């Protein structure tokens, strides 16, 4: 729907997945990014500056240790883990998670998640100093997405969270602890914003007439992303509040009215072919 609307408006659009760690952020946060030009200008997604191992002229991914280096946070503000969670976290080393909990107390610690969601690595997760963090969430003590400090039995503090997201130390967040975690967790990593801004600034400063109109064209920066989307079946498993029908039988009828589970291929081109 997004792509159809942008094409109707005659925008030239490029899109693709960007990992914040590839642009200097200390977190592995992948997001689908769209850039659009009403004038059909030659937009490009920025090229990564960092890589997991640092090769091909790219720097290695930044680690949590690097992100928090020199942080002055003598009285950190953070959400409190429950006494039970603190007791369990005593068994989890830096970089570990629920799999490090002794088998004798693992099921009790996980509760119902032992049967349903126990495979998620976010349960009782203690961060590693020597790698980027996973994508920050709005609640670092949620059972399935914990962000526990590598050495202390607490989640990352507000200021540590902000450092990982790229905010300067003097940036002010309003509200209580929960509100501030939410503001930071919902933000776009500053490294990604900066990379996109630099790409757009370069485009504007080198603006020149194009021999080919690109208005109304939708281009994807990654051909494999198009293949993955087209191979994915249409599903009825939307969140309950978003479902238009109730019950499996009615859902199947609704799907059949739309042509079944087969998804219509994306009407997009690969970026190099649009240039």
Predicted segments, located by residue:
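Conserved Class I SAM-dependent methyltransferase catalytic core
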Residues: 1-37
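S-adenosyl-L-methionine-dependent DNA methyltransferase catalytic core
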Residues: 5, 31-275
């Amino acid at each position: 729907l997004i792509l159809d609307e942008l094409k109707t408006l005659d925008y030239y659009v490029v899109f693709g997945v960007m990992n914040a760690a590839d642009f200097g952020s200390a977190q592995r946060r992948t997001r689908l990014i769209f850039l659009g030009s009403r004038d059909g200008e030659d937009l490009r997604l920025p090229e990564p500056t960092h890589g997991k191992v640092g090769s091909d002229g790219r720097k290695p991914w930044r680690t949590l240790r690097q992100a928090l280096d020199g942080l002055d946070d003598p009285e950190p503000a953070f959400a409190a883990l429950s006494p039970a969670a603190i007791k369990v976290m005593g068994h989890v080393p830096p970089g570990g998670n629920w799999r490090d909990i002794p088998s004798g107390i693992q099921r009790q610690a996980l509760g119902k998640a032992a049967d349903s969601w126990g495979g998620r690595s976010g349960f009782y997760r203690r961060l590693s100093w020597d790698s980027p963090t996973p994508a920050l969430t709005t609640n670092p003590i949620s059972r399935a997405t914990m962000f526990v400090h590598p050495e202390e039995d607490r989640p990352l503090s507000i200021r540590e969270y902000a450092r990982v997201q790229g905010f300067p130390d003097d940036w002010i967040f309003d509200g209580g602890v929960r509100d501030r975690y939410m503001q930071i967790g919902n933000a776009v990593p500053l490294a990604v914003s900066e990379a996109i801004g630099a790409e757009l600034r370069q485009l504007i400063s080198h603006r020149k007439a194009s021999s080919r109109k690109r208005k109304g064209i939708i281009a994807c920066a990654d051909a494999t992303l198009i293949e993955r989307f087209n191979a994915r079946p249409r599903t009825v498993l939307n969140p309950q509040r978003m479902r238009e029908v109730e019950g499996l039988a009615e859902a199947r009828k609704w799907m059949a009215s739309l042509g079944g589970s087969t998804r219509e291929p994306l009407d997009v081109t690969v970026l190099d072919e649009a240039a």
